[in-house]
Curated annotation (Swiss-Prot):
It comes from the Eukaryota. It is found in: Secreted. The gene is NPVF. This is Pro-FMRFamide-related neuropeptide VF. Keywords: Amidation, Cleavage on pair of basic residues, Neuropeptide, Secreted, Signal. GO terms for molecular function: neuropeptide activity; signaling receptor binding. Belongs to the FARP (FMRFamide related peptide) family.
Amino acid sequence: MEIISSKLFILLTLATSSLLTSNIFCADELVMSNLHSKENYDKYSEPRGYPKGERSLNFEELKDWGPKNVIKMSTPAVNKMPHSFANLPLRFGRNVQEERSAGATANLPLRSGRNMEVSLVRRVPNLPQRFGRTTTAKSVCRMLSDLCQGSMHSPCANDLFYSMTCQHQEIQNPDQKQSRRLLFKKIDDAELKQEK
């Protein structure tokens, strides 16, 4: 590696500095010339008369020309479609003119603005022991009476039936405990009389 002499180094720095300063001055001159051209733009842009073949437009002519030549567009045919079908795709063979019954739109998803709760309640069977739901005494009574009608005449079956159906009601309404027992005794007595 050669050692650069001080004279060569000074020449190199002077050349680069002069090059950089000339670029700065040229940029300033361009900016100034742009400013001068903007100031002088009004001088050049002033109308000096109309060249041959051109004519000027008056405000009245422009006003008369405008609204008469505007083409008014009618509303699109999509707006004539019912609102319930507006977001539905045109697939699965559905046409724009096709009419549907109210029952067909009831099963559409929430995206089309329908509520899903009604269809979910219809599809999900009543599962009393799931999800923290309890059964009512009436449903248990009805179910047990339907299943065990033949074997209800023995005292053990009556006690089992009473304990299964009334335990839930006794917890909820302890003051009605005695009246429920009396009701079952009357039912048992009536069944015994029917057997005889």
